[in-house]
Amino acid sequence: MAKLDVFDIKNKKVGEIELSDSVFNDEVKEYLIHEAVKIQLANRRAGTVGVKNRSAVAGSGKKPFKQKGTGQARQGCRRAPQYPGGGVAFGPQAKTYNLSMNKKARRAAMRSALSLLFKNNKLTVLNNIDLDNVSTKNFVGILNGFTLDKTLVVTDVENRNLELSARNVKNVKVLKSEGLNIFDIMKYQSVIFTENSVRKVEGALQS
């Protein structure tokens, strides 16, 4: 099994942790990672753009004047595109960009992303990262001790002090293990796990 050193928040080694090979040392399938990221980003799109065509514009459908005998061009109704306030011809309509990926492929993509981080030495495991109070300075000091930047921090439980301490730090994001997703894994250059969060992620992604 793959192993990683476990550190405390002062960057002192306090032990080792065995990682599941099926989660953190799996075959890296880059095409699956690409597909999963593409789907996640597509599903964020709202697709709310839209204009009213002649059937959606409020107003009467009555013919404005008779067909013949006026000398004017024939008209069907005042909701037509050529009238002020009429509907738009061939304008953009709201659409959904949602894509889907089956659970087996989604989990395989997550395992590939985590395995890629492990093989590139971008994973750090801490025994815990509890903060007694809200302090951005203390949190930045912890990160500087590991010489990390653009970092994703994954915890096993909600840690309000940690979240508030990190929210104003550039290129840092704190997530619970349940919220871990492939886009954030690939976006951040390094990932810090707590020991318990590693076990939770392994339990969720075990093949």
Swiss-Prot record:
InterPro entries: Ribosomal_uL4, Ribosomal_uL4-like, Ribosomal_uL4_dom_sf. Residues 58-85 are annotated as: Disordered. One of its GO terms (molecular function) is structural constituent of ribosome. Keywords: Ribonucleoprotein, Ribosomal protein, RNA-binding, rRNA-binding. One of its GO terms (cellular component) is ribonucleoprotein complex. It comes from the Bacteria. SUPFAM superfamilies: Ribosomal protein L4. GO terms for biological process: translation. Pfam families: Ribosomal_L4. One of the primary rRNA binding proteins, this protein initially binds near the 5'-end of the 23S rRNA. It is important during the early stages of 50S assembly. It makes multiple contacts with different domains of the 23S rRNA in the assembled 50S subunit and ribosome. Forms part of the polypeptide exit tunnel. Belongs to the universal ribosomal protein uL4 family. This is Large ribosomal subunit protein uL4.
